[in-house]
Amino acid sequence: AETPLKAEISETPGFRSIVAGAETVAAPGRDYTAKAILRGLEPGRAYYYRFIAPDGSISPIGQTRTLPEGGIDKYRMAVFSCSNMPFGWFNAYAHAAQVGDFDIALHLGDYIYEYQRGDYPSAKDTVAGRLIEPANEIVSLADYRLRYASYRADPDLQAIHARAPMLCMWDDHEFANDAYADGAQNHQANEGDWQTRKAAAEKAYREWM
């Protein structure tokens, strides 16, 4: 079932004054993800945000920052790429979230990887406790959705998203290794139609990112 949510924006973490708000819905057609567009915010300002469910439950508080306007003296970005979870812990996310001396996080792609467990990295190179879901190579919409959910369960990835806005672009592994218009190195004929797989990957990306 759909769940209506209320998004609130404040200049303080205590939310004593709400400066903007919006209504949104977490729906099964979007894998129960939700996004809200907030208007009327000041440029170059830090804000706090939260979501409130119909029963009064409140989400963890996140921080964001609007883009500046006009000339600026300094703008700092925390840059990430190629985050293959089974290879190790997301210490870079954790460090950036803890230090927090940047305006925006920028992810240059390969936010997730499509491989099955034990493929890349190999089973012997997989760090203990870093098991991805699903275990198989992701091909279907349900597969891609679960892989994003698996990554987002990581507390360090949650921390960086809660600490600052993240601007993301996809590379190839959000679809399959060495993807191109009509196929990919890591897409075989027995995995179905490439265009169907590509559309599923893009839908999951736009839901979760």
Where are these regions (language model features)?
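Metal-dependent phosphoester/phosphodiester hydrolase catalytic core
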Residues: 1-209
